């Protein structure tokens, strides 16, 4: 999934904050997509998981984490991400082999008052294609998962350096994933999870700028009620680890919030709703993330 929201927010601020022209996050992956038990992949089967990702922001921060212009900033992004997931019965190194992929649809709108005048605009498009292979283990009170995936630059992308409102990023990204869920009690009513992702970026095809690598941590603590409902807290931390080839400043963000999920066994259907408040952001937008996830097993 794309971190489109931040790029659009910064685009709205260009006239007021020229020093942040190249401060957009370098991650393809948008934090907050996963939450409680995010490191646990399902048992063998074919699934369609529909992510509905909302991001709002009304401020832009400098590298010190302090709020800067523009005035009356209002930015909104909605991403619909239908993910196809197949966990096979085949095992490798004791883990179930799986494959998944998605192609996101992205809508963005933003408005702001800048020294150059009032800015307002919106855009809609298809983002970059992602495909991944996974391994997953379910051992007593632990779930483990690893994955290796690639983002292909199939969507419309920027043609010049700096922020852009296009749904694609214009470069290949190779993402490595590893995570674990620990069920604290034998009944598995308490769970603690951590999901780590690292993205290696390549040169942007038009700007010839190579974005820095990015690290993302998504975590969750949850309690199961009546066997079919989970409630808990979830959060994320994302940081640009290495600098862009154009020497622009690094960025990072952290968030926390509540989550509730419910399972409908007879219908083989699962739904989760999560909110994350970004309490810290450096060299990027600071806002709110909402995620509604619908999962159906076939």
Show where each model-derived region lies.
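Residues on the lipid-exposed face of transmembrane beta-strands in outer-membrane beta-barrel proteins
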Residues: 50, 82-88, 131-137, 148-150, ...
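Surface-exposed strand-loop-strand hairpins of Gram-negative outer-membrane beta-barrel proteins
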Residues: 25-26, 55-79, 112-123
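Transmembrane beta-barrel strands of outer-membrane/channel proteins
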Residues: 31, 48-54, 99-107, 146-152, ...
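Extracellular loop and loop/strand-boundary signature of outer-membrane beta-barrel proteins
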Residues: 35, 66-72, 114-121, 159-167, ...
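Residues that define the transmembrane beta-barrel architecture of outer-membrane proteins
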Residues: 44, 74-82, 120-129, 170-174, ...
């Amino acid at each position: 999934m794309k971190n489109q929201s931040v790029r659009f927010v910064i685009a709205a601020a260009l006239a007021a904050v020229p020093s942040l022209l190249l401060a957009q996050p370098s991650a393809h992956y948008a934090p907050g997509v996963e939450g409680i038990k995010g490191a646990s992949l399902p048992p063998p089967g074919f699934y369609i998981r529909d992510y509905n990702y909302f991001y709002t922001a009304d401020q832009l921060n400098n590298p010190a984490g302090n709020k800067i212009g523009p005035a009356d900033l209002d930015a909104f992004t909605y991403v619909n991400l239908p993910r196809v997931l197949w966990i096979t019965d085949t095992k490798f190194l004791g883990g179930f082999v799986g494959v998944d992929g998605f192609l996101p649809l992205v809508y963005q709108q933003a408005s702001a008052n800048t020294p150059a005048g009032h800015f307002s605009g919106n855009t809609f498009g298809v983002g970059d294609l992602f495909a991944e292979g996974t391994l997953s283990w379910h051992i007593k009170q632990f779930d483990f998962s690893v994955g290796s995936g690639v983002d292909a630059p199939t969507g419309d992308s920027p043609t010049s350096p700096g922020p852009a409102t296009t749904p694609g990023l214009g470069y290949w990204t190779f993402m490595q994933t590893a995570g674990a869920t620990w069920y604290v009690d034998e009944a598995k009513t308490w769970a603690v999870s951590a999901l780590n992702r690292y993205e290696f970026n390549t040169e942007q095809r038009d700007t010839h700028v190579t974005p820095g690598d990015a690290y993302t941590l998504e975590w969750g603590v949850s309690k199961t009620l009546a066997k079919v409902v989970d409630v808990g807290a979830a959060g994320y931390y994302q940081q640009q680890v290495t600098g862009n080839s154009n020497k622009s400043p690094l960025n990072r963000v952290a968030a926390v919030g509540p989550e509730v999920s419910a399972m409908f066994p007879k219908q083989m259907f699962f739904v989760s709703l999560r909110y994350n408040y970004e309490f810290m952001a450096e060299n990027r937008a600071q806002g709110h993330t909402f995620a509604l996830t619908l999962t159906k097993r076939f």
